[in-house]
Amino acid sequence: MTQIHSDNLFRRAQAHIPGGVNSPVRAFKGVGGEPVFFVRGEGAYLYDVDDNRYIDYVNSWGPLIVGHTHPEVVAAVQEAAAQGLGFGAPTATEIEMAETLCRLVPSMDLVRMVSSGTEATMSAIRLARGFTGRDKILKFEGCYHGHADSLLVKAGSGALTLGVPTSPGIPLAVAEHTLTVSYNNLGEVQEIFNHFGEQIAAIIVEPVAGNMNCVPPVPGFLEGLRTICDDYGSVLIFDEVMTGFRVALGGGQAFYDVTPDLTTLGKVVGGGLPVGAFGGRQKIMEMIAPLGPVYQAGTLSGNPVAMAAGLATLKLIQAPGFYEHLSRQTQKLVNGILGRARDADIPMTANQVGGMFGLFFTGEEEITCYEQATNCHLDRFKSFYHGMLEHGIYFAPSAFEAGFVSSAHNDEHIAATLQAAERVLAKLSS
């Protein structure tokens, strides 16, 4: 499989774009080599500039739950664009989106549209601080909530130390308000609240962690967070940018039957276009301007073309049996790869929730936290990744990113993927 045109484009891109990409993970630093440049998508397939075809399990990092260029989504976008690309004023379409989200997401009484997941989480944090009058937030190691200053923070040297920045350019005074503990460790959360509880505005958590690959909550974890927030008057924020409409129609909160105070959304809700949203309890959301004193605004918020793409997608995923089929296809894929890894005598485990999955090259039976994920055999993943790419299978170019199945993936696509995996894993074991 040649990538001459991709390589040429990457060299050209580096002359005018930092690192040649507009988001770091696209640069292939996690797997080595140079990125693939794509030109079009159709259903479960992507086509690169060298006319290679791939079965796609990235799906634009999650949004394309109905596959590439679904005719109903494309038609909705074309119709909306013909009426105008944006007005910077209210439209009926954004009302329909708000009504749909409040009907489908258990926690949402009111919702505000934004243009990205980072905007959504940043705004939800500000709102939680404004509502509680507190400054500190608690997040979990390995969970990614966008690139806002208060969220690019890691734990200090001990469980009770204040946070430190993970990027230059973030003031220590900002990072110190962010406390970080291990995902799925309720004991650490309780210890932090024992010391700082009256100062903590919010816990922000992914119901299923998707940036340490795919790590679901252990039984009782989300329920425990709900109880702790209730006990201390803190706001529970579910970051469902990734899990929203991906693991279930009502997101992770419906799947696990735990209702947060605020929810952030993105990805699927935009149908492939740049959209984010945050919403929740009426009492909290009424703190947002123009009703309340907590300021938030956006020139492109509620863009009519993006709303049309999102609404068309949300209509499709409400079809009877949609999520049952998505989960079955994902399970076929994951179980098939695990079986072929066993046949090749290569240690591997996997996690799957709905149409979201993660593969881990490890002898451990279960991956439940970031430390375990980082201790997996990363070099083996790199070899597996490039082997699958050569066979026309496109996974995320990082061992710490979840994979996604769409409704466009049929049995033929799964079978072709498993055939490629069998060959690649056999070669890795030789």
Curated annotation (Swiss-Prot):
Main localization category: cytoplasm
Entry EC number(s): 5.4.3.8
Catalysis performed (reactions): (S)-4-amino-5-oxopentanoate = 5-aminolevulinate
Single Gene Ontology MF annotation: glutamate-1-semialdehyde 2,1-aminomutase activity
Biological pathway: Porphyrin-containing compound metabolism; protoporphyrin-IX biosynthesis; 5-aminolevulinate from L-glutamyl-tRNA(Glu): step 2/2
InterPro entries (alphabetical): 4pyrrol_synth_GluAld_NH2Trfase, Aminotrans_3, Aminotrans_3_PPA_site, PyrdxlP-dep_Trfase, PyrdxlP-dep_Trfase_major, PyrdxlP-dep_Trfase_small
Compartments in which it is found: Cytoplasm
Pfam family, one: Aminotran_3
GO BP annotations listed: protoporphyrinogen IX biosynthetic process
N6-(pyridoxal phosphate)lysine carried by residues: 267
UniProt keyword list: Cytoplasm, Isomerase, Porphyrin biosynthesis, Pyridoxal phosphate
Signal peptide residues on this chain, from the entry's feature table: none
UniProt GO cellular component terms: cytoplasm
Cofactors (names): pyridoxal 5'-phosphate
SUPFAM superfamilies named in the record: PLP-dependent transferases (SSF53383)
Coiled-coil features, chain-numbered ranges: none
Quaternary assembly: Homodimer.
NCBIfam families per the UniProt record, alphabetical: hemL, PRK00062.1
PANTHER family: GLUTAMATE-1-SEMIALDEHYDE 2,1-AMINOMUTASE, GLUTAMATE-1-SEMIALDEHYDE 2,1-AMINOMUTASE 1, CHLOROPLASTIC-RELATED
Family (UniProt): Belongs to the class-III pyridoxal-phosphate-dependent aminotransferase family. HemL subfamily.
Protein name stated in the entry: Glutamate-1-semialdehyde 2,1-aminomutase
Organism field: Nitrosococcus oceani (strain ATCC 19707 / BCRC 17464 / JCM 30415 / NCIMB 11848 / C-107)
Organism phylogeny: Bacteria, Pseudomonadati, Pseudomonadota, Gammaproteobacteria, Chromatiales
Protein encoded by which gene: hemL
